[in-house]
Structures are given as structure tokens and as C-alpha cells.
Amino acid sequence: MVASGLNGTFGTPFAWMPDSTALIAYTVPANRGPAPVAGDTPTGPVVQESAGRSSAARTYEDLLGDAQDEALFDHYFTGQLVRIALSGAARPIGAPGLITEFSVSPDGRYLLTERLKRPYSYLLPARYFPTEIAVATIDGQRVRTLVDRPLADDLPVDFDAAVKGPREAMWRSDAPATLVWAEALDGGNPRAKVAFHDVVKMQAAPFEAAPVDLAMTPARYATTFWGDDGFAMVVDREWRSRTEHRLAVAPARPGQARTLLTRNYQDQYGDPGRPVVESNAAGKPVMRFTPDHKAVYVTGDGATKAGAFPFLATLPLTGGEQTRLWSAKPPYYETVVAMLDDTGQRILTRRESAKLAPNYVVRSVRGGSAKPVTAFADPAPVFAGVTQRTITYPRADGLALSGSLYLPAGYDAKRDGPLPTLLWAYPAEFTDAKVAGQTVDQGNRFVRPRGISHLFLLTQGYAILDNPAMPIIGEGGTEANDTYVKQLQQNAQAAVDAVVKLGVADRTRMAVGGHSYGAFMTANLLAHTDLFRAGIARSGAYNRTLTPFGFQAEQRTYWQATRPIPK
């Protein structure tokens, strides 16, 4: 139907029209031609201009580097939006461009697009390039330009930094054609001392009336769960404190948000779950209400020290306590895939255990019956004899840690003695020691290695402590990375001592490994401890003078961290 092919460089290259009569597709321009080839003779130097102002920018990889890169970027990423009828007839919409996002309004009359423009940057990724967000008719006639912003090269290095002006534009799922977007109230600087950091705005078609403020958020806007005129849920998050707010709003009465809950979003035990969403008649995601319309359904992972036991519950629109309708029971890990009726009494779940491969089940909540729908077999029965259990152990300062211990099939500790052991880990930063110390038993999960998994070493006689907790904690205004090495040493020492004490690991044959930031961890443990004979540092960055404007979860610049600047 599209001879030139789809262009998936920016993601999924098609979307259905709400009435399912046609597709909107991002296609390769028909006249694209061959890719540009660089000449053997340089045409000139690479020139970068300074605007005469200081600007910190994180270190990124795989950036554009010269005019040839720019030409290749244009060649491969430029696309043409096309409307394709079920008959196969195709009609172009608007002009070709670097269209990073596109979506059709629920009534099928308008098209929201986000496209990149020149000049490009050699220091920043494409998401910071000059951007135009606009609304057109479904035939491509421009109706409204929401924003046409320049290169975002003046943002603070903080994670919650945001561009000035409209961003994160979307359609309201439960209205015919209402444009929704967020704007920073703090100039894009999350450190600004303001009561509200973002405002969420709405504007209904034909986009001539002034926008209205749906809600102002205490932290940086994250997402919205749409319902109807009377209820929607706006979520924001603040990285520095790991705080999340969930606000109840009534789109028909904008500006009257009320707080449903405030929580630490790293808190596994206190995770209330997320609203159940379904596709409405227009194919847009909306929350699922109870029949009396007094609550919405929510699902969550149900993390506890004894294990994760997913649940289905209802959350009153007025807030307050949830009502649990169903939760998984040992020895299973069973997630809710879909609700099969309006009352939450008939559900489709995906059930697994340490020994049983995941399969789908239709479950009667009230009656308790479970009818298998699929019968998928163990994809790697050679690993069926591998034993796995969650072990818990204390750090030197008393913090509870945990990890998943895997032992080879047929292994007997008394008969075979201690094994060479690999710790495969990844550090995580926390602002609350109680949250960092949460342990969740993984014994009800079905685990089989695939790809380049380190778990394949089980076939070679290794014991593996997978994902041993490596928390790096900064409480009370302190920065976690100020004690990174010390806490890393404590975490590793506790893990090694734990597996040696169990009699399954040989202290003289310990190895450590990790990917990316786990590779950085590996290098530090090899340099600062004598716990390990070898390490696997896979795809890491190790020289922090090459990432002076922040890395991973570190928001400070190198100079702020090494010589703190007075507040």
C-alpha cells in the first residue's frame, strides 16, 4: 500500500483513525533517493558558535558531529505523513519533515504533530533540537501552532529541568478534540522556590478561546489518566525527593485539583498501583470506572517482604482507602491482564511460579475458580533443576539487603562444597533508608536466562547472586554520591559474607559484574576492595572528569561536588 515503505526511525510509524476506516502512517518520502555520501575532500572546518553565555550540558554519546551526519540524519529520519484508506488508496498529509510524534484527535478531525527543525546541535540529542508543535486538520491544513521553540541549550542539568513554554502536548482521551499540554511555572528550573512548578492547560477545538488551567502541580508534571468530565488523575514527580503527587481533577470544572495521595515513588511496600485503563470508542486510553461510577479500578504489584502478590482493587473518586477485590496467593506470581466484566469479578491473569512457566488464566474472583487458557511449556527445561531463592542479610550499618541466589542444577553444598560465585548488580540511589532497605522475596517468579544473560554461567558450575542490593543513600539533604565508595564497599562486603556463610560460595573465587552503571560499580569494587578475583565491566563509563555536568542520578556538576558552592 506504501511503495516507499514505513519510516519507523522515531517509533511506531502508524496509528488507526478512531473510526478504523484508515491509517495515518509515517512513510519514507517517495523521492528520497540514495543516502548522501561524504566526499574525500573536507569542505571546511566544523564550526560551532557560542552565544556568549555559560551553559552546562551533560555528556551524551552518538551525537551529530559534522555536516555529513546532519545530511544522514535528514535523509533517514525525514518522513511523510500519509492517510491510507482500507481500500489501499493513499493521500499525503502536509509536507515531509522530521516528525517525532503524531496523533489523531478522538473525533478524527485533527492531527497533532511534533517536528524537529534546524539548526541542529552537536552537543545535545535530538530531543533538544528546535521543535514545532502544531495542530492541523486531518487533511493537513494548519489550524494552530502551539509552540515553535528554539534549541533547548540553556536548561539546568537537574533531572526535572524543563523547556520553557508548552511541552508534552496530547489529546484529552475522553473529549472530541481538546488539546492538553504542560508548561513550567518555574522557568524550567526545578530548584526555584515556587508553590507550583507546572500548570496543565486545555484548549478545545476550534482552538480560538483562551486555554484554561486544568491543574497546577507541586512538582514536575508526569502524566494524566483520563476518565470523564467529572474525574481525571494528574500525576507529578520530583526527582530530588523521589516524591509523587496524584491529583484528582474534574475537566468540566478546571482549576480545582485536590490531592489524592503523596508518596515516595521508590516505596515498593506502599505502592498503591495504577488505574486500570481501557480503550474507548475512539481507541484512546481511559480509566475504568465501577458500575456505580464512585470508584476506579486499580492494579498493582503488591510488594511485601514475603514476595510480590499483584492485586485488583477499587479506589474511591473521593480518595481514601482502596478496597481489594483480589490478590495473588502463594506460590504464584499472578498479574491482572484484563477485566472481563464491569464488576471485576471475572479477570484474565498471567500466572507463574518458580517451577511453572507463565500461562494465562480466566479467574472467577467470587467463586475462586481458575480456568487455564494457555499451556506454554518450559522454554528451557535444562534449567529446571536450577535452584533459586531470595536471601536477606544486613549491611554493616544495619540496613537490610537482599539478592536472588541461583545454584546449578544438581548442586549439593555438603557434597560439592563452595562454588566460584558471580555477583551481578546495579547500584540505585535513595533518599530514604527505610525504602532502600525494603526486600521483596522473588521466590514465586519463573526465571529462565536468555540473550547474553549472566545466568548462563550456571551451566558452567558457578553460583550467581543476581541483583544483590547496592543502595547508595543520601538522607537529610546529604548527597548519596558523597559516600558512594564507602556504601558500595559495605554493600559488597555484606553480600560476599552472606553467600560464604551459607557455604555455597568460595571467598577466594568471587567475581563481580554489571552493565553500564553496573560496570562503573564493578571498576570501583575492583579498585577499592580485595573481595573479588575478577570483574566483568560491560559497557561502562569510568572517568567522571569526562562527565562534568552530571551522570546517572548525580545532578551536581563536577565542581559543585568536589568543592560545594554555598547555597
Tell what function each PLM region has:
Residues W424, A428, K434, Q438-K567:
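Active-site-proximal cap/loop segments of hydrolase catalytic domains
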Residues A90, A257, T390, I464-D466:
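Conserved beta-strand scaffold positions in the cores of enzyme catalytic domains, especially
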Residues T374-G417:
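N-terminal cap/lid segment of alpha/beta-hydrolase-fold proteins
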Residues I133, L179, L260, Y360, ...:
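Conserved hydrophobic/aromatic pocket- or pore-lining residues that grip, position, or stack substrates
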Residues T21, P420, R533:
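Conserved acidic residues
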Residues M1-G385, A400, G437-Q438:
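Beta-propeller folds
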Residues T9-F10, G188, Y411-A413, T431:
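Short beta-strands and strand-coil junctions in structured, solvent-facing domains, enriched
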Residues W239, R288-F289, V298, G302-A306, ...:
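C-terminal substrate/ligand-recognition segments
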